[in-house]
């Protein structure tokens, strides 16, 4: 399933359960982040959604591309770079809290984690 974001034509893929990028795997109130695969460069609700829907594994966003947004806030649909995302516990645009447990999966999403 794919959902176009409100602020751009960027699609978010995955086993989505709502229009704020929550998915079958992660669906708490704070699970509103979609992340970009370093291989196909598409945004997915989580690495598990990606891997279940593709023939290639989710690869982390390369450090050389950290200046390019690779995170979408599902609440407001704005994009963030790795550093913008890592530097806060909530969206800098809409103030929606991010799930602090996502840090446990950082290695799946960002090359240097």
UniProtKB/Swiss-Prot annotation:
It is found in: Cytoplasm; Nucleus. It comes from the Eukaryota. One of its GO terms (molecular function) is zinc ion binding. InterPro entries: Mito_Tim_assembly_helper, UCP017292, Znf_CHY, Znf_CHY_sf, Znf_LIM. GO terms for cellular component: mitochondrial intermembrane space; nucleus. One of its GO terms (biological process) is protein import into mitochondrial intermembrane space. Zn(2+) 2 binds at residues 73, 76, 91, 94. Coiled coil: none annotated. A zinc finger (CHY-type) spans 16-96. It holds the Pfam family zf-CHY. PANTHER family: HELPER OF TIM PROTEIN 13 (PTHR28082:SF1), ZINC FINGER PROTEIN (PTHR28082). This is Uncharacterized protein C29B12.12.
